[in-house]
């Protein structure tokens, strides 16, 4: 294909993309990715149209999910059909009070507008309904140079490792300040290093699939964003770390899906981030990093945990995660301070409108608290489907923690098949931990407000513990808590 034809092809694809992004009244059902067989356990239809139900079968506890894009608050009729009579069901978030109608093996219910939902039928595996808000990415991409990854003769079947070609496309597109577009396909790759002044746009059925060879990751991560400014990943496509689908079996441990450090002005919007071997996304020594409308799908084991955190803001400031769902085997939304040089503080962090499922903490500060200060940390509007600990501050190093808010939590269940009791509140300063630490910290000013427990509290504990008179916890205000 000559250069002229390639350029024309890119323009045509770009035009098609923009037309496809026009808002419509009917929901748009996202197509299958094609990397694994679809779910046989669940059949889902939306307004009478059959949806593709993905199955992450290689996780310790497999999950199923389908994606929809919805414009506005149009009512959607959801029908879920399974292979057995439905004896019980639950639709989370429970606070929305969604009631369905059961006839034999079919569950019918209605949702109004976008939202993230989990349907639990009998003792079956979880079904995630990911109903995304329509985002006008066309407006966000306006006036930028558009490059199609297919211009680089990339294999889109997932059978060939394409790291070098994709990296070349990233480097060349960044020099233009452009948008690198990934159309439908499976793109197998090792570590990719992002650049400043670049946007990646993932089509609905685009899948960036990590290699299962640990040697293809120089810095133990799939998406590496280091010393980068003005970078975005947009779209409803998927980035997969291949953690439980092969990378762990080949000896990989503690590989991030996304690792950003020394960055400024980073945006992720709409993408699915799934199956890392370790923390899904770590943001370190960075500022103005904002995640919106994310779907984070990690491994969650039957017992204990697997260090598969959701989103970790570490030694960073002015960052946020807004409107997300996180399925994780460890802590869901986390704030840390691993900067031992104490150059950075951790400040102005917001987590808002998040649906969580975890074997450990739903919302947490710590345990790594090496920075001088944590300030203005807010966890708001959190629906907790399952956790071991709901609200956590573990100050195990030397720091000062202030202006922390846990507000508008809806906790559906506490469950942890380990030895320790679950906890609603766990604020602790200590020098006794699984690692060497000092516990020379202070916590002063925590607001716990409007916390609603939607299950019984049998066996659930709470604790607020200082180390001593000097390193202690002060000014914790708890108001508006209910148990239903």
What are these regions (language model features)?
Residues 22-484:
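Extracellular/periplasmic carbohydrate-active domains that bind, remodel
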Residues 1-26:
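Bacterial Sec-dependent N-terminal signal peptides
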